[in-house]
Amino acid sequence: MDTNWLYVLLQKSTADPLERLKLGNVILNEVSQRKVSPHPKLVNDFLDVMSGWLTGSNFKVSTIGLEILDAALRTSPDVLASYYFDRCSVLIERMGDAKVQVREMAINLCLQLAYLENSSPVMLLDRLCVPGTGFQHKQWLVKVGSLNILREFLSSSFALVIQQAITLIPQLCRLTNDPNSEVRDVSTQCLIDLMVYGGKPIVAKIAATRLINEQKMATLLQRYQTTVATRGDLPPKHTITMETTPAQPSRNSLLRRSLRSPAKIIHPSASTTSFTSSARLSTPPRPTTTAAQSLSLAPQTPSPLSLPSPSGGQMSRSRDLTRSSLRAPAGISISRYRSSSCAPAAQCAITLDDFKKSFTAVPKTTIYSNHDIREKLELANLVLRNANEDWSKRANQLKLIRSIIINCDENIDRSLLISIINELADALEFSIRDLRSQIVREAAVTCSFLFETFGMEVKNVAECVLPAALAQVAVSTKVIASSAATLTVFIVQKIQTRQIFTTLSELSSSKAKEQRRQLAVVLETLIASWDLKSKQPILKQIAQLVQNAICDADGETRVAGRKAFAKLEQLHGTTADLIFRELDPAKQKMLRDGVSSSSSSLNSDRDNNNQKQQPNQQNISQKFLSQRSASAVDKSIQLSVKPQTTAIPSRPTAMPMNNRLPKSSTSTSFSAVRSSGYGQNQSTTPNRAKTPSDGFAGSSPHYTNGNNNNKSSSSSPSTSTHQTPIQRVASNLGSSSFVASLTQEQANCLQNAMNTAKDEMSKNNEDDEFLLDEIRKTPPKEVPRSYNNSPFKPSNLDSSVHRSYNNNSPFRPSSGSVGSGSNGSVQSIEHILKACTSSSLNEKRDAIVNLNQVITDPNLCQLECKNIGDTLSRLLAEGNNTLIISILDTISIFIKFQYKKLDNWLKLALGKLFAKMGADALPNVKSALSSTQKMFLTTFDPTFQLKAVCDFMCDPVHLLSPKSRLALLEYICLLFEEIWPEDPRCLERQTHLDTPYTRAAIRKMFAWMFDPRIGAILMPACERLVCALFALNAADFTMIFGELPSECRDWAYRILQLNGQQNNQKPIEKEKERFISNNNYKPCPLDNEEIEKPIMKTTYSTYESTRKEYSQTERIATENQYSTPPPPDYRTSTAHLAKNHVDQAAYIRNQLDAIRDFEKADKLNEAMANLHGMMCEGSFTLWNQFFDELLDSIYQILSTFSQSIRKKLALRILQKMCTAQATKLFDSTEIAISKVLQCACTSDDNTMGVAAEDCLRILASHLPLTRVVLISRRILSQDDDDQRGVLILKMLTRMFQDIDIEELHLIVNDVAPCFVTAYESMSSTVRKCAVFGLVALVQRVGMQRMEPHLRTLNASKLNLIDLYVGRAKSSESGASSN
């Protein structure tokens, strides 16, 4: 065994998380390709190591450990299955992990374990039913995971788990009353599933338990009836016998399933989220092939899923709880088949041609009578419904169904045959859901043959099997997926019912990209094959589904969506226009490019222009497609083709097109702008020569002889091309009654006006012209004289819209516009802002460069500043890492020059900045963000900044990530703490802070801080903010915090006390000494620069007036005169040590060495402060290496009698250790509580009791409840020390308010007598604490539960308890009403 590869790797396992990650990747790679040795000691060692990884606190280590266990189970199921069941409790505990990914991976691994060949869901349910685990676990997430597993078993293996499910009915009923809402919802849904699958006997049994009140039971029955009536994906009806009968198979036979029948567990219809590539559980894992293999081996007519996913063969599976909660993964990496001859290829995919060939590839069957047909089809129905039947027999029965239909003669009653076929719906749906690929393929072929033969007569079968087929599309087995995909195409082609469309529309929100892709494919089929009567009521829903497919995250789904859009546009142009209008410009461009490339071959033979006469067309098109800037186009080419003003439609269609204006040109609908190509580069399109009737009679003699052979897109190619001038113009303008009523002169004038407008728009040569939401208004050009007398002359033709500039401004453009492109062309602000939203990266980069020149203009108006600010905010939120530094620099320049006009923009800009600062970024990006933040701080009025930040903080619309919230809080701290010494524009001392927005922000801060998910991240910033707020204005601080809840006030008081912030003002020297001795958080200035803080702070108004009068030298001298250098022993930040484990270990070792030296109290206190600072900053990560040693040192410090050692700091370190690594303190619970009590009782410091109370509260809430209660009872019963008793009573009282009600009921009988005994104490302090504890118990568990323990008290003491309980209830009701 010493030479085994796994044994060698396991010997390298350490406690270092980084080393575990590296080792885990090596083990995962090996265990995915090699089997694990069956040696018992090796397997036990392997699982012990993995269990240690799972129980650790590192998220990535837990994830890699679960991946290793999954890969090992897939490669060596026969070796590891029994060992996994022995350690199933570890997986159950991981179902309650804080990370969603870990929870899902643990659940999927449990499901995979249940579906092994020699395993069963019954065995896993046995583990989940153990008291204290699974359904009875104290962690609500574990309960939810267990319930989801039960729902999976109910939907997939109902016959196996029915007896256990019936036993669990009382437990499920109790869970519907769980304190957690999510547990209640899942348990309710589980009961509904059980009722749906089990029928009326289960409903009666649930009602007979009487554990659910009448109202809830009525709701359950209503939801049960609704589900039965509406759901189309229910499993076959099961006949359930409540009592075990001799006909039932024994449980051992269910646990030991036959290897020859791998399809006994019927999987659910919906797919689930999996962390590996998923496959069917009963068949060997079969990875998909690469794209090259698929293209070379696939048949000529591939099915919609015959090509592999671009993700390299690993198809993600999504969890759809409305159909089936969870799905066990059994996929495997393609590396298993690198050297194997059994590797599957793309030729396994099933195509439409394969289906049609298989229709008649069946053995011949002789049919004698109608009775003979009924007998044979009923036999087939029974065989197909039996999951225990051999798969070959089931496949033969599916072929028999096709053979019966093929060999029927005219004497057979057709109505009888169709009725019997409809009775096969459940059996066929059962076969479609099967795990055996041969069964799924034959079932899909049989169903397709039925739809092809009978059509709408078997619509019930189609509606039944469609959900199962769509669910099978997402599996990784190519035969199953492609068979199901082809079946869906047949269903949509032949069955046109509303139920079919409803089932399809449910896939729009599926998490499986394969299902969404197949939805887009069948949408194209639906649009093309369904008649108008069936499509008209659901046309809007079809359009919405097509739009969702176009905007999908998957590339292949978007391609299929664009094809569906082309078909929709061809048949329903108005609906396509509505979709096109709602799409963003990038999607519109994709539609134009994709459809034009697909329809170019159709238009090439109908184009009158010679391709050779336009040598630059192809080159310019390539520049456009490669996102080159339009300014690179040669202007000489542009001038040479300028008279040719006809443009191609910006969204081509699959129909033949001509080169004139479309018929809808005069319409005000969006299709006119979309199809007429406003602003299109004319040199890139095929053009026709203009005739004199087009309005260019006097422009050039070269164009007087036009080509008269052009055909209209509305006319047939066989019709005559001769048209009169008015007919030609009218055909260009459209065929509406308005155009028909025009005279020849009026029509010519209208056509000339439209041509002139297009000429003006084509001068800018933009790539992204489709982004313009309105026609740019340009100076008028000379128009034909006949147009001046026309009644159709637009009123705004002679007006030009340009921003007015000051003639003395150095930034004034020569032509009313600013900015210049790469070719020297002048650009307007509107043009630059439009270019900033371009999808072209080069275009956007050029626009940002031009914008830097524009924003320095002091004459920008308020509206222009608003538009520029909105554009910069959008650019900052896009997350483009390539341009982010340029964008931040532009924002800094914009603020510097235009900050007086940006009051309304400040709130939005700060929000985008905080969101960006909360995201992971490179060091250079972080530096740029810091510089931009500094520009905000040093430019805007600090009071206005505070209001903007507080308003944004309380705005419920904006949701920030935890790191973004941290950035926001630190920004407020910077406003308070005067962090920028070279520009002291921050809040003055005694600034009025008692405002509504400040109060709301403080309440919001506490809501964030008390959130258990993010409170640890925000705690240091909240402490810093409270101290800074108190230092800025103590009076307003008192007013604000006076209206907050008591726990918030107590917390703030403790923070101020710990940080040395007292109400009385002492001399500066003493204040600094006390601040240094008591402060555990000392902010480090940015970039580690020493900052000199002036005692006499310069106000904002004074600074504005003196900044212009005094030179920099005088100001620096003034600051130096009134400045005091910072204390030299401020603790530096250790955040950089979080990822540098080598330096972190050395630093911690030095501090621990200093802590052991009790003779040097100063160094010991400094070392404790440094370690506590590391824990506050999150840079202490080597817990496994130093936890035991640090805990021993803390215990020694708490036991010493030296008064020079800061024991309060040791208590805070113990709190941090318990919060971060509570499990490591489980075994020393009694020691920890005893040490804290000893420290509090032997100290002369009056404030030590407060610190001890906080520490005891943390220990009681994190350590095992039974041990805490046991030591508390021992201390209260044996110790006569009143101080220790008071601390224990306060600890228990706090614990009563924090723990769950079920846990409290378990310990009431143990702790209530102790409080009653303490109520009889001689000490008034002990009696007071006992009363508060009894009141807390009565509030939580009720007077009826406490009455047996309170009988020994006299009437006066009971009245006192009733009085306090009444006051507590009244205060709670008053707080809730407010």
Curated annotation (Swiss-Prot):
Skewed-composition ranges (Polar residues): 620-630, 637-648, 677-690, 786-812
Domain of life: Eukaryota
Endpoints of the signal sequence: none
One Gene Ontology cellular component annotation held by this UniProt entry: cytoplasmic microtubule
GO terms under biological process: astral microtubule organization; cell division; establishment of mitotic spindle localization; mitotic spindle assembly; positive regulation of microtubule depolymerization; spindle elongation
Entry keyword Amino-acid biosynthesis: no
HEAT repeat ranges per the UniProt record: 168-206, 1305-1341
Gene Ontology molecular function: microtubule binding
Annotated region described as Disordered, given as residue ranges: 231-254, 266-325, 590-725, 775-823
Gene3D superfamilies reported in the protein's UniProt record: Leucine-rich Repeat Variant
Disruption phenotype: No visible phenotype; due to the redundancy with cls-2 and cls-3. Simultaneous RNAi knockdown with cls-2 produces defective microtubule cortical contacts resulting in abnormal nuclear rotation, defects in maintenance of spindle length and spindle displacement. Simultaneous RNAi knockdown with cls-2 and cls-3 shows nuclear rotation defects and excessive spindle displacement.
Biased composition (Low complexity): 269-283, 610-619, 664-676, 704-721
Cross-referenced InterPro entries: ARM-like, ARM-type_fold, CLASP_N_dom, HEAT, HEAT_type_2, TOG
UniProtKB keywords: Cell cycle, Cell division, Coiled coil, Cytoplasm, Cytoskeleton, Microtubule, Repeat
Coiled-coil residues: 740-767
Biased composition annotated in UniProt, kind: Basic and acidic residues: 775-784
Localization terms from the record: Cytoplasm, Cytoskeleton
Free-text function comment from the UniProt entry: Microtubule plus-end tracking protein that promotes the stabilization of dynamic microtubules. Operates redundantly with cls-2 and cls-3 in regulating microtubule processes which position the spindle during asymmetric cell division.
Family statement: Belongs to the CLASP family.
Protein name in UniProt: Protein CLASP-1
